[in-house]
Amino acid sequence: YFGEGGFKRLINEGTFFPNTQFNYISGGSTTDCASLMTGTLPAHHGILGDFFFEQKTREVIPITFDGKSVGIGSQENHSPVNLFASTFTDVLKVSTNAQSKVFSIALNASNAVLLGGHTADCAIWLDTESGKLATSSFYEKGLPSWCDKMNTDFSLDNMTDFIWQPLYAPFTYNYPSANDISSKNFLYKAEKYKNINKKITAFKSTPFANKLV
C-alpha cells in the first residue's frame, strides 16, 4: 500500500490535498463522505446524518434508503436519490462523455453509495447479513463479474476467523501506554462471536476489513 504503486502514486500522480477543512459539525460518516465527494456543505448536498425519521412510516431509516431500489445480494435498499449535489465522480463522467469507469466499494452501503455518486457504474458494500459483496438494482449492470466470482469462490470465514493483536511487543511502539500493558490487553478474537452478524460487524472494525476492500 505504501510502495511506489500505492499511496505514493496517488500523491505524486493524482490530485492531493494535504489540508482540507469543512466548516460544519460532522453528522456521521455519511455526511462526511457526501461533503468530501461534493465539495460542499450538508445544507447543500442534503446528507445531514446517517439516518432520518420517515414520518409516513414512523421509522428511523438509513439516509440512502430508496424504496424503489432492490438489494442485490442484500436485503438493504439503497441509492443516491437523497444526495442533492453532484460528486466529482459525476463531473468526471460528464466531462468524459460517460467513458470513465466509476466504482466505489466500502464496508457499509451508505458510504459506498455516496462515494460513487449518481452516475457510478456500481457501488459495492460488504453485507452484514450475508457476509457477501452486495449492491443495488439502482446500478443497471448489477455486481461486476469479479464480485460474483469472489462471492462464489471466497469464503469470508477465512477472514472473519481473525485474531487482532499488536504485531510487535507493545513497548517497541512510539507511544506506548503509560500503564503496564501487554499484547493480552489488546487481543480480539472472532471466535467469541457465535452469531454471524455480530462476527461480521466486529470484523468491519478491524484492519482485516480494510484489507478486504
Give the label of every model feature segment.
Residues 2-45, 101-105:
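Short, structured active-site-proximal loop/turn typified by the sulfatase FGly-forming signature C/S-X-P-X-R
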